[in-house]
Amino acid sequence: MAANKERTFIAIKPDGVQRGLMGDIIKRFEQKGFRLVAMKFQQASQDLLRQHYIDLKDRPFYPGLVEYMSSGPVLAMVWEGLNVVKTGRVMLGETNPADSKPGTIRGDFCIQVGRNIIHGSDSVESANKEIALWFKDEELVENKSCAYEWVYEN
């Protein structure tokens, strides 16, 4: 697995936190076989969020997005596993919940795009940038689960 092992940044947004969906979302990633490397429950500052969403700064919804994301606590996480960025995005569903299939996080728990409960990195490069923005190196925990060999072939 080492050749394709990667990490992704997943954040449960304020609406997901307020609706009590953190456990359900974490459970899905654990059941898939991904390993939690870091987790932080925090009130994100607008400065942090402006950096995080810098690629969207020219979009008309950008100010509202930053305001919404700073309106309550966020659960920021780093997950690791084989093709975790791509698979994580599939698990999340489409950005617009109306386009998300049942069985995806957004398909099961969301109605509107402006309250789509979760963020996931869209590429390995974005994941690396987002992880570095939200976490210090010493906050990333190396821990091989005893279930590792039951999830991955040699």
Swiss-Prot record:
Its cofactor is Mg(2+). GO terms for cellular component: cytoplasm. ATP binds at K13, F61, R89, T95, R106, N116. InterPro entries: NDK-like_dom (IPR034907), NDK-like_dom_sf (IPR036850), Nucleoside_diP_kinase (IPR001564), Nucleoside_diP_kinase_AS (IPR023005). It comes from the Eukaryota. Keywords: ATP-binding, Cytoplasm, Kinase, Magnesium, Metal-binding, Nucleotide metabolism, Nucleotide-binding, Phosphoprotein, Transferase. The active site is at H119. PROSITE patterns: NDPK (PS00469), NDPK_LIKE (PS51374). Its EC number is 2.7.4.6. Pfam families: NDK (PF00334). It is an enzyme of class 2 (transferase). It is found in: Cytoplasm. Belongs to the NDK family. Major role in the synthesis of nucleoside triphosphates other than ATP. The ATP gamma phosphate is transferred to the NDP beta phosphate via a ping-pong mechanism, using a phosphorylated active-site intermediate. This is Nucleoside diphosphate kinase A1. It comes from Xenopus laevis. The lineage of its organism: Eukaryota, Metazoa, Chordata, Craniata, Vertebrata.
